[in-house]
Amino acid sequence: MAAKPGIPKGTRDFSPVEMAKRNYIFNTIRDVYHLYGFQQIETPSMEMLSTLMGKYGEEGDKLLFKIQNSGNYFSGITDEELLSRNAAKLASKFCEKGLRYDLTVPFARYVVMHRDEITFPFKRYQIQPVWRADRPQKGRYREFYQCDADVVGSDSLLNEVELMQIVDTVFTRFGIRVCIKINNRKILTGIAEIIGEADKIVDITVAIDKLDKIGLDNVNKELAEKGISGEAIAKLQPIILLSGTNAEKLATLKTVLSDSETGLKGVEESEFILNTLQTMGLKNEIELDLTLARGLNYYTGAIFEVKALDVQIGSITGGGRYDNLTGVFGMAGVSGVGISFGADRIFDVLNQLELYPKEAVNGTQLLFINFGEKEAAFSMGILSKARAAGIRAEIFPDAAKMKKQMSYANVKNIPFVAIVGENEMNEGKAMLKNMESGEQQLVTAEELIGALTK
């Protein structure tokens, strides 16, 4: 009995229609990246585990897909090690490679390995899949695409400004209304300092980053469980829940963080970004959000997140500044900043809001009906001219019944059908049928092309 076919949990197949929609997303993002001078690279699907481990925190390391070595990988493992049942230790013995978790760490590795060939500042983009051994659920997959853009080799805040312009341009092209949220890790560090818990900055940021998901009471509970004092938690409340305009929030922060040099630096950086963007005429809202803390360990400056306003869904884009990601690979002092568009969530938003342009998801424009060998040969001549003019066209491969061929056109939403029988061949023309209106007209090859390209 044949095995029932299936795919791993957290992965998906994509139909031709879905792929047309996904390519619309990728192509839109790619076009905007090119507009801002970014160049494309690709890195391998698998990296050495030594490259990946320790870059995403303890939780991130648990979500790495590890690849088993080829050959007799148990030969070098002692009975004692096997009996210990220490999964992490055993995996290190017979797994040297892993599937990439994101595109940022492989990019840092790429920069270090190719430093002599790269012109800095290096503006790169990358659109590739990543894998995470997460528990699959609605909107969360084990295999998904990221669409990253990063600038490395420059600490200018103009890079942050440009990335926010890219975000605004992309979502304006999609027709999705968004709120661009920004914060700064230096502000969060300053807050940790002034509440007397400077050494707990990671615990604080991980907890408050969950505010939207679990609510304030649960955030406070998690902070207490991490050993943060009740007094510090009380001091934290009015700061992270600060309201008002961006300018009002910045003014308050200057007072609140007056004793923190690091915190004031973060306020200064945020003020520059927000003030510069104000002169750029962004189409979308931008908000300074002090609860934005993005849990990844490597952010050191500005951090960003984008939320769709008309759909209940998580973050659809995120990013931030990292000052020494390449340092772990032996190349210290290279500052960078980047963003990552969540293509899968953008796909869901565009579906829910029905924002895909018709031309983006349309396939074949013209189908030639096949009545037999002579008619097909005649049709192929017109078909070649149509394709040369950029018309997406095909001929039904078999001389099947007319009903079957017309049904094929209907199911595939092909808007025009060309019918070539003996009478049409005698006149050197084709009968062009509009499948929506039912209108038919006898046309030359040139007239057919004109009708479909106007």
UniProtKB/Swiss-Prot annotation:
Subcellular location field: Cytoplasm
A Gene Ontology BP annotation from the UniProt entry: histidyl-tRNA aminoacylation
Catalytic activity field: tRNA(His) + L-histidine + ATP = L-histidyl-tRNA(His) + AMP + diphosphate + H(+)
Cysteine pairs bridged by disulfides in the record: none
Highest rank taxon of the organism: Bacteria
Residues spanning the signal sequence: none
Family classification: Belongs to the class-II aminoacyl-tRNA synthetase family.
Name assigned to this protein: Histidine--tRNA ligase
Organism (species): Bacteroides fragilis (strain ATCC 25285 / DSM 2151 / CCUG 4856 / JCM 11019 / LMG 10263 / NCTC 9343 / Onslow / VPI 2553 / EN-2)
Record lineage: Bacteria, Pseudomonadati, Bacteroidota, Bacteroidia, Bacteroidales
